[in-house]
């Protein structure tokens, strides 16, 4: 028993390295910005910054909704049907995870050219490519967790497949689907590389941070980073808390 306890302490010590590694930069940037509050106030009143934040929030939200609209049906098919090429389809879904995001931007630009160049469509297209796997995989996992016998009973009692989907499958898988939507939104909010190539304009907050850093240095880019983190983390934590309450 004692050996197992020591092993747990050892694993906790090893794992805590990553926790500290993640938390330390977050705490540090907030602490240093608090010492330069005047710059933060100036940035909060910068119309360009506010517009960039609005662009990021709107496009990320639109991307998450589009990911769910197309990803939920695909997730249901992957969870419920075996078909030739299914493993290939699942592999394709995960491809965006391994492609460098600057390459994603080049691919989209080569494919769609001026149709998405420097536009909201381009921003959403870039975000969608990198975030869709989260929505699809979460939906698939959610439907896999639903007992298929419940669907069969409903079908036996005369319910159509579409009615069974909306009355049984979808409500029971909803927490997982919502989690996927949140992750798709968060991934969209953090995207830079693909957007940089496809749609430098209209500027998102992610691009503006990079631009301010290149042109004006760390002090100018830090408050925008803090604002973007505050907004993103607040929304992310709230949505995760909401999903947790629904699961309870």
From Swiss-Prot:
GO terms for biological process: transmembrane transport. Residues 31-56, 113-115, 186-223 are extracellular. The chain crosses the membrane at residues 10-30, 57-77, 92-112, 116-136, 165-185, 224-244. The keyword Membrane applies. It is found in: Cell membrane. Signal peptide: none annotated. Residues 53-239 form the ABC transmembrane type-1 domain. The keyword Metal-binding does not apply. Residues 1-9, 78-91, 137-164, 245-248 are cytoplasmic. Keywords: Cell membrane, Membrane, Molybdenum, Transmembrane, Transmembrane helix, Transport. Its main location: membrane. It is a multi-pass membrane protein. GO terms for cellular component: plasma membrane. InterPro entries: MetI-like, MetI-like_sf, Mo/W_ABC_Transporter_Permease. PROSITE patterns: ABC_TM1. Pfam families: BPD_transp_1 (PF00528). SUPFAM superfamilies: MetI-like. Belongs to the binding-protein-dependent transport system permease family. Part of the ABC transporter complex WtpABC involved in molybdate/tungstate import. Probably responsible for the translocation of the substrate across the membrane. The complex is composed of two ATP-binding proteins (WtpC), two transmembrane proteins (WtpB) and a solute-binding protein (WtpA). This is Molybdate/tungstate transport system permease protein WtpB. It comes from Pyrococcus horikoshii (strain ATCC 700860 / DSM 12428 / JCM 9974 / NBRC 100139 / OT-3). The lineage of its organism: Archaea, Methanobacteriati, Methanobacteriota, Thermococci, Thermococcales. The gene is wtpB.
